[in-house]
Amino acid sequence: MKRRILACMMVVACMFSISAYGQITERERPKEWDNLIEGGRFMDRFMPIPVKGEATSNVWGAKDVLPRYVQNGIENKEFSYWGGNIVKGDDGKFHLFVCGWPENSPKGHMFWPKSIVYHAVSDQHNGPFKVVDTVGKGHNPEIFRMKDGRYVIYVINGQYVSDSLNGPWKAGKFTLDPCGKKIIEGTSNLTFARRDDGSFLLICRGGGVWLSKTGLTPFYQISDGSVYPPVEGHFEDPVVWKTNVQYHLIVNDWLGRIAYYLRSKDGLNWKVEPGEAYMPGITKYEDGTNENWFKYERLKVLQDKYGRAYQANFAVIDTIKWNDLPNDRHSSKNICIPLTKGRLMSVLNKDKINAQTKTIKVKIESEDGFDAQKDMDLKSLRFGASEEVNFGKGSKVLKTKKSGDDMIIFFKGEGNGLNDKNFAGKLLGKTKDGKLLFGYCRLPGVDYSEPAVPEKD
């Protein structure tokens, strides 16, 4: 009996310790998520990581991340790395701007407020990245390029600006004008997306939307509230990006260790997609090796010329942050995980698509690594509103027609689910070798105009 009581006390103490640290809690998922098919949630886009070098256990880390491939992303036994993002330079190389601090710092991971931004470079988009320069003080950098070609690195409470990825970098601060509106949870953890006219959209930590004419001129808040999902969560680490079709946003519930995916036609009005955007357990290699990192934070994406995300990089840690102490076996790094890239596609119908539409014509483009005329499993394809195709429904293929190197697919209009609330159609299915295939396209009859940057004296 005494042993049972002692065991219960130990379990309660352990649970209290974790709760006190504020590191994890269990979130109940909506029941409807159980019916999502592959490709219905963003998390399905994470692909196995190519193997580089040999997996080793002769490195820091809890047993759940051993053995591992240290050449993925950036890793150094003498430094703890955290958030950052990658851009492809005009030199053809990949440039990672990441924050970090010495592993033997007096407070371990809690030394992060004094972190430094490093410039690391690799010939490959997934590393290994090697530090070549120091930018300056700052935490959780995000780099973007302005219309005039200059680069801007955002850090908490500051910025760095340069004509070149190689510097020199000039320190400064952003001007954030709430325009009389309530600022939502402060102005840290900012994330940026360049609009077609060269202006910039910003999402702040609390989910507020801001606009700037250039990215350096003042940002003005245009939203009255948060655009995040209306569910319980301790949200942070938003990442926003824009493609040739729409805006994308992922935000992380750090306490629940679950992230949410949203889409928007204009950057102001957002639609929450079902299913997890990411969660622990997504680091898997092509040879079957798994790295079970305790936490994934500071997601950023690497984009192609159409804005499509083809790689995610995360700050990861092997334990509770407060347990990462100086000169111990724990630390953090920044890793890279490939993403399935959406296909290039367009609707050829001229009239608005709805329940009365008889046939939907969709053009799928061929590109490097994808032959639209040979690679698709046509029987698996569904097209229509994401609310339908994410759950295995939607319009089915009626017939096909070749168009140059591309393919035009005629879908039956029945079951497309598209209405006035939809601004993008979704294609979902598989390739002939069983891999995920998806894509989004704009729809006829939809107004894609975006909110203007406020004019102020």
Question: What are these model-predicted stretches?
Answer:
Residues 372-390:
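Short, surface-exposed alpha-helix to beta-strand junction/turn motifs within ectodomains of secreted
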Residues 1-9:
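Bacterial N-terminal signal peptides that target proteins for export
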Residues 364-372:
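Short amphipathic, basic-aromatic surface patches that mediate peripheral association
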